[in-house]
Amino acid sequence: MKLKFTKMHGLGNDFIVIDAINQSVSLDPATIRRWADRHFGIGFDQLLVVEKPGESGDFRYRIFNADGGEVEQCGNGARCFARFVRDHDLTRKNTIRVETACGIIMPTVEENGEVSVDMGIPRFDPARIPFITQERALTYPLNVNDREIEISAVSMGNPHAVQIVPDIDLAPVTSEGPAIESHPFFPEKVNAGYMQIVDRTHIRLRVFERGTGETLACGTGACAAVVSGISRGLLDSEVQVTMRGGNLRIRWEGEDQPVWMTGPAVSVFEGTIDL
């Protein structure tokens, strides 16, 4: 049996997107890992699945990392998801109500082809991240590889640990990122973000993603970094986030308000693969 897919990317964070409404799809972790292999498979950071919704959305959005594990949220993927359902005539709406494992998101396809996404309200309560600590704080000490670092912990539907560094080009992303990802204080693992503040409206960012490794861009990581910077009084409410794959615009008006992310979503090619 052959399965149709579309290869897409958001700032180099790449995906395959599968329509599970108009074709039968059955996935398992071993199959996803095989397809994710960049030498023997298709190659991607995440696999995105478009499904019929429950009662509250237009579509249901499922996300699987390259290691085969299902995760709650992916910001760059959300933009690609929205472009996919529009480009494949699954909807004519500009603003789409999408069900995810962590709640409803509302992507809007703009006239210029970019996609803006209401990413929901960030969570700082340690129990909801989840993060093991005695009480909520702006920053937390974390012992990693025999040194203490200072992080902010926030959930954007998935957990993030964000630290400020003087120069992200020199940050120990690949050597330290895996230790943060698997730190015992994060029982569901965590995405490790490294943020360099250029000024109050501009940051540079690298992210070691849970279950994937470092990617060229991370949408939820950009949201988490900006939210942590605003919470600490270091950033304004609208910030440009520069990652190795390109730029996102993130806007957040403060606690109990949703985070808005705007950026590109690009289709690369369509193909079929044997199940």
Curated annotation (Swiss-Prot):
Gene3D superfamilies: Diaminopimelate Epimerase, Chain A, domain 1
Signal peptide: none
Residues carrying the site annotation Could be important to modulate the pK values of the two catalytic cysteine residues: H160, E209
InterPro entries recorded: DAP_epimerase_AS, DAP_epimerase_DapF
Pathway noted in the entry: Amino-acid biosynthesis; L-lysine biosynthesis via DAP pathway; DL-2,6-diaminopimelate from LL-2,6-diaminopimelate: step 1/1
Pfam families for this protein: DAP_epimerase (PF01678)
GO MF annotation list: diaminopimelate epimerase activity
Known EC number: 5.1.1.7
Top-level EC class as recorded in UniProt: isomerase
Catalytic activity of the protein: (2S,6S)-2,6-diaminopimelate = meso-2,6-diaminopimelate
Isomerase listed as a keyword: yes
Compartments where located: Cytoplasm
Active site residues of this protein: C74, C218
Main location: cytoplasm
Gene Ontology CC entries for this record: cytosol
Known role: Catalyzes the stereoinversion of LL-2,6-diaminopimelate (L,L-DAP) to meso-diaminopimelate (meso-DAP), a precursor of L-lysine and an essential component of the bacterial peptidoglycan.
Subunit details: Homodimer.
Family: Belongs to the diaminopimelate epimerase family.
Record-given protein name: Diaminopimelate epimerase
